[in-house]
Amino acid sequence: MSLSTNRPLPALALLLSLAGVATPAAADLALATSKNCMSCHAVDRKVLGPAFKDIAAKYKDNKGATDLLATKIIKGGAGVWGPVPMPANTQVSEADAKKLAAWVLSTK
């Protein structure tokens, strides 16, 4: 089998090399899954806790929302979304909490 020179092999090679690269949104979803956020939350529907898109809508005009939510991720909270409290997640680092908070706020 011979390869003709008119085939787009460089483009194909590039596409194949990018196939294994995760998008930032997928990476942040993986982080949320690994930190057990998805046990109580979903992106687009209420589970035990509110949907991430609802959280994003609620805090869309809050300039300090990323830090506020990062603190809630680590320390927990109650009373904002009803009677069920969010437990503390002390195993989540501050950097990961901020990354998760920024991702949650980016959901639509």
Feature map (PLM): residue ranges:
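Sequence/structural segment immediately N-terminal to covalent heme-attachment motifs in c-type
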Residues: 26-43
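Bacterial N-terminal signal peptides that target proteins for export
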Residues: 2-12
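N-terminal signal peptide c-region/cleavage motif recognized by signal peptidases
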Residues: 17-22, 27
